[in-house]
Amino acid sequence: VGVEVSVEGLTKSFGVQKIWQDVSLTLPSGEVSALLGPSGTGKSVFLKSLIGLLRPEHGKIFIDGTDILQCSSRELYEIRKLFGVLFQDGALFGSMNLYDNVAFPLREHTKKSESDVRKIVMEKLELTGLIGAEEKLPGEISGGMRKRAGLARALVLDPEIILVDEPDSGLDPVRTTYISQTLIDINAEIDATILIVSHNINLARTVPDNIGMLFRRQLVMFGPREVLLTSDEPVVKQFLNGTMIGPIGMSEEKDEAQMAQEQAMVDAGHHAGGVEDVEGIVPQMKATPGTPVRKAVGRRQERVRQIMHTLPHSAQVAIQESLDTTDPGDHIPAYSGAGSYEEGTYAEAGQGQVNDNAAYSNQGYGNAAYGNAAYGNAGYGNAGYSNPGQDNSGYDNSGYEAGHNDPGHGPSQGRGQ
């Protein structure tokens, strides 16, 4: 099973520009989590912080119990071997064919024979649907194939944690769905902890077990998918429905005057874009028939059962419906905790009120209640920022700079064309 990743009080700035502050969450081991947010909210910066490519000013990052912000360079080098990373642009070496791209981490970081390397590479190419394309250069294949090649390379060291940065970037909706299915199947096959950074709504609704959202330098919330997908938080509803009505604007944030003006236009009959509000929970993608049963499903159901009484009422209802409709052959029996679920309400001794986002603080909605999962509704700031671009093309998908031979900072090589 993949390892647990936990961050506590994480704050990152570029100079005087604060990217996000006091971010705390836990990625449950072996589950698929997604981090959402408008463009420029620091989602990719968060990924790079998890593997030590960027160093936050404050906080802790625990990878399998080790704080990578306090460990030695040698320890960090070893911890990075737990990771597989799919960067937004694939980060393939343009001068290498797909076979050599996928083989690169094995040749760079192991002493395996070429026969063993070939066996592993072909296995990962088959898993990602690239058999027959191994001799092609990155410039000769489609964007979707480049994504899958980057994913194959991220898998060759048998990672326990897979970080995926914008898997839908540059892809049409259909290819994005295929990539999403591949990620679910990989989780079923190797039981790795997966974190996907995205602002793709369909992916957000259908893929992850857990969802978080960054906005205005804060983690708005993080928890079981049902919490965010049933949330009445304005920024969450706006984001999930892709509409102009809400606090997100072209410059990341809006003032009250702009929000009032846009609402007046809608009231006058102007279409605000986006889709009609989606009611209820869209079913989560399942592993392809023939792949192993996703063990994460059972672990997650057991975990959310333990915390369900602390969740908003709408999330409780959605979770209970999910438990009631679970295939009996899958994993989990009906809920049997201290509370009881009756006629659309969750009743527990001493807890009769209906939960909503405004009541989170009254439910112990913080680290003490969730074991550092930090399901918090942090206050929003007022000023926006633009996220400085980061060049990933010099890194291989194990989280190393391509070409370095020690735990220090070596030169990047073989940048993709």
Where are these regions (language model features)?
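Conserved ABC ATPase "signature" region
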Residues: 66-67, 114-133
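Conserved ABC ATPase signature
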Residues: 137-141, 145
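A short, proline-enriched helix->beta-strand linker immediately N-terminal to the Walker B motif
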Residues: 156-160
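Catalytic Walker B motif of ABC-type/P-loop ATPase nucleotide-binding domains
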Residues: 162-165
